Swiss-Prot record:
Protein name as catalogued: Histone H2A-beta
Any Pfam family hit: Histone_H2A_C
Species for this entry: Schizosaccharomyces pombe (strain 972 / ATCC 24843) (Fission yeast)
SMART domains per record: H2A (SM00414)
Span(s) of short sequence motif [ST]-Q motif: 128-129
Modified residues annotated as Phosphoserine in this record: 128
Any one Gene Ontology molecular-function term assigned to this protein's record: protein heterodimerization activity
Residues that bear N6-acetyllysine: 5, 9
Cross-referenced InterPro entries: Histone-fold (IPR009072), Histone_H2A (IPR002119), Histone_H2A/H2B/H3 (IPR007125), Histone_H2A_C (IPR032454), Histone_H2A_CS (IPR032458)
Sites marked Not ubiquitinated: 120
PTM annotation, UniProt: Phosphorylated to form H2AS128ph (gamma-H2A) in response to DNA double-strand breaks (DSBs) generated by exogenous genotoxic agents and by stalled replication forks. Phosphorylation is dependent on the DNA damage checkpoint kinases rad3/ATR and tel1/ATM, spreads on either side of a detected DSB site and may mark the surrounding chromatin for recruitment of proteins required for DNA damage signaling and repair. Gamma-H2A is required for recruiting crb2, a modulator of DNA damage checkpoint signaling, to DSB sites.
Gene from which this protein is expressed: hta2
Length: 131
């Protein structure tokens, strides 16, 4: 028998698989790891930290893009523009809290009119008291 655990046959070489593919992510785990090491955030970076961070970033991006796509569809547009990102973030309570101090270029403002500035309702809608 030849040396090895496969029982005589030569071991079939597996193709290399990225850490992103192993974790089932679209965001690059290797790049996040490199940025964590080069950013001087800590002397050492564990193996699980870049995977977790890439997963969180991917989730946030997917959440924002889904809401922005809904805002674009509401405005009868097929392309997401910064205005749609602004509306998506500001209309979502948790994202607005997370990105409260972020300025989005060309985002505009969320439409809002104070109730005191609206014209008062006239008596047309009230039921008549005729007998």
């Amino acid at each position: 028998m030849s040396g090895g655990k496969s029982g005589g046959k030569a071991a079939v070489a597996k193709s290399a698989q990225s850490r992103s593919a192993k974790a089932g992510l679209a965001f690059p785990v290797g790049r996040v790891h490199r940025l964590l090491r080069k950013g001087n955030y800590a002397q050492r970076v564990g193996a699980g930290a870049p995977v977790y961070l890439a997963a969180v970033l991917e989730y946030l991006a997917a959440e924002i893009l889904e809401l922005a796509g809904n805002a674009a569809r509401d405005n009868k547009k097929t392309r997401i523009i910064p205005r749609h990102l602004q509306l998506a973030i500001r209309n979502d309570e948790e994202l607005n809290k997370l990105l409260g101090h972020v300025t989005i270029a060309q985002g505009g403002v969320v439409p809002n009119i104070n109730a005191h500035l609206l014209p008062k309702q006239s008596g047309k809608g009230k039921p008549s008291q005729e007998l």
